[in-house]
Regions:
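Nucleic-acid endo/exonuclease domains
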Residues: 1-158
């Protein structure tokens, strides 16, 4: 996925979730909290040469897989896990992929790839799930900054 495709994908995802701008998303909110706790601004949607998706006709080596947030001074990657990472969501899972599997299955494969590969390069992966916070019936975070920063501190500093 090139930068244009990535932005288009995020726009579709955000529209499906009723989010006007990416900066309004739960992912952005949680990463903002991580920035504060870690005292560093994350490189958002960062890619590494060694972390790649499955090969396709247009990219035989596989496209670089983005991570939600990378903190180079701490060598930490934070991945925010929305509900589509743990359950089937028709909007997200409707497309087939270059790998010949559904999007939900590909997401599981790529999530596991991050878990396997990042530590091999000395990068600590921290996964933060929406379920760590108070959330509504749509599994969106019910935001309470004071409470939420404590959740993020507990997860990042363990």
């Amino acid at each position: 996925m090139d930068q244009f495709d990535l932005e288009k994908h995020f726009a579709e995802v955000n529209a499906a979730l009723g989010i006007k701008k990416r900066s309004d998303s739960d992912e952005s909110y949680v990463i903002d909290l991580c920035d504060e706790v870690l005292g560093e601004l994350a490189l958002r949607q960062h890619t590494f040469d060694f972390l790649r998706g499955d090969p396709s006709e247009s990219c035989l080596s596989g496209k670089k897989l983005p991570v939600d947030a990378y903190y180079p001074n701490k060598n930490i990657v934070v991945e925010y896990r929305e509900k589509q990472h743990t359950e089937s969501v028709a909007f997200f899972d409707r497309r087939s992929t270059v790998s010949g599997v559904g999007r939900g299955e590909q997401r599981r494969i790529y999530d596991q790839r991050r878990r396997d590969i990042l530590p091999q390069y000395g990068i600590k992966l921290i996964e933060i799930s929406y379920s760590s916070f108070n959330y509504d019936s749509k599994k969106k975070i019910i935001r309470n900054r004071q409470r939420d920063i404590l959740v993020v501190k507990r997860l990042l500093l363990k």
